[in-house]
Amino acid sequence: MIKTREWKNGFRLIYEQPKNNALISSIYTICDVGSVHESDDVRGGAHFIEHMCFKGTKKVPKTEDVYVKYDDIGAYMNATTDKRYTTYKLRVHDRYVHNCIDLMSDMLMNSTFKRTEFQKEEKVVIEESMRLQDNAESILEDLKESVIYKNSSYEYPIDTLSYHKTLFSYDKILELYHAFYRASRMILSIVTNIPFDDVIKMVNSSYYAKLYKANPSLDGILQSRVIQYSDILQTEPTYHIEKHKNLSTIHLNVTFRTCNYYSDDKYVLDLLKHLLSGMFGSRLSMLLRDKNGLTYHSSVTTNYYEHSGELSFYAQLTPSKILKNGAKPGVLPLIIGLINDLVKNGVSESELATAKRNINGKMLLVLEQSDSQSLHNGINYLLKRDVSKITPLNKVYDTHLKGISLHQINGIIRKYFIRNTMNVFIIGAELPNLEQVKHCCERLH
């Protein structure tokens, strides 16, 4: 059973017991700030703040002191900046949960943000951005989202090397930190064996429960950083081919616009994704790898934001095999052919039944660790706010997936796999001819 509690300062707690027998607690603090809250003069700021929260507080003044405290209790700690939120993750033995809540609340609420540490950490963030710049899938993802979510706050990358052509403004990043890292924009999501009332006591004694003085100027910053949405009415396919001379392979992405985070269509799309690429014998892998020997790495992915979403076919391949494989079709025409077959013939009863059994089994395996359970609860609580609208992770299959019919999944295929909402992205050193790519994709019904 999921339980929640909200404090006078707006801080929220969402709690659930684990579905395994391990004496391990999974703790996420989810901060309601991401790259979507940034203005042009502070791009990359949310990610930079995530780094700075590890640089010490008055109580724990040095980075090494923070790390030693976590190391001393055998805790696993990590953090991630997303477009919509920032997460701080902890896995630890139940006996040390109080230590972790106390330390994490201090880190996030009371970072000293020393200018000297800021200047050192900027070099580290640049190194991280350089690593992403060498990652073809990351480049392709940024390109895709700049098109699919154009004119919205989701258009911009979380961080990229271009943001660091000039040095960050210390004052502006610090201002962003103080505006967004406040109790009313934080959620503690915990999955633990510890009783709910005991967790409440731990939060009460932490900095999460502290009342802070109102600051009108910071409130003004929040009001100016409202997330911008854009519902683009796409009426024809788009093609985006970019040369990246250091890549030995081509990275291909065929993306269709789909539904938003709150739509029930996402469950049908996720099941379809699983059927197409989430199993050993899934359609995409069998077609490209087993039957034609064309790719080692291919996948179908889905993603949803508050206003829109997408489903993408992805493949990494040798440049010479994108359009042709000798006398046979190459990767792109095979993907287009697969989509045409899905639209015309749909999926079979046996495929649907296998996909359901498989996704149910994999969701049960996920519950062996409580991390997914904790993250699921926290993100849903952030975006839905109403706990009655949150389906516990162990109930998602029975509630949303088990009852999906053949009629539903084939209807979703026809609803979203439309040529006019298709977007094709290709990056590599050796690129195909644009007109040939268009000619191939025009075969989509």
Where are the predicted features?
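His/Glu-rich zincin catalytic helix
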Residues: M1-D65, L174-L287, L332, I336, ...
